[in-house]
């Protein structure tokens, strides 16, 4: 998709009511399972059109945090405050389709929504082109690669015309080239469409170029800041040395 066509196609730019800067604020969030604290003292603010990445080790609470924001986990303390009239799309870390459901990419993309959601055909066409899945629309979902599946799920998120997209380890199944393509796409939709993105990762080197803000957690926040600043943080080096080395 050319730069010129990207500039012209802005069908799913959204405007939120009563938003100055933040589309999401998390204040003093804590979460426990079976009396074991998973998250504690989490404070996060996400501005319109920003990409905020949660960096941390496996088992450090990243997925639990995403589930709280997505409304899946309810048993937390603290506050999760959204802008008025916000629309949210969620892309989980693990997604699978039963082998008993042989459906095409196109069918999945167009039919796996609530009947209440009005789908805009111009938005659908634009999303398919932007994400680059036009060539696999007639393929069976079970036959596409893991990387293509992630692009399909991203397209599915975008068709809902969200203001905030939650991505849990979205590139874990991709090779380096597919990762670069995915990050280019989310950078495009964040800046040109003013869609905010909250995503998780355990790979610091690949998320630095596309992130506006990085928050390092291991059950609680150890350090946070803009990419250039976070790389200089001594705490990051001490706590997350294995991730810096990647």
Swiss-Prot record:
Residues 24-244 form the ABC transporter domain. Keywords: ATP-binding, Cell membrane, Ion transport, Membrane, Nucleotide-binding, Translocase, Transport, Zinc, Zinc transport. It is a peripheral membrane protein. Transmembrane segments: none annotated. One of its GO terms (molecular function) is ATP hydrolysis activity. It catalyses: Zn(2+)(out) + ATP(in) + H2O(in) = Zn(2+)(in) + ADP(in) + phosphate(in) + H(+)(in). It is found in: Cell membrane. It holds the Pfam family ABC_tran. Its EC number is 7.2.2.20. Belongs to the ABC transporter superfamily. Zinc importer (TC 3.A.1.15.5) family. The complex is composed of two ATP-binding proteins (ZnuC), two transmembrane proteins (ZnuB) and a solute-binding protein (ZnuA). This is Zinc import ATP-binding protein ZnuC. It comes from Wolbachia sp. subsp. Brugia malayi (strain TRS).
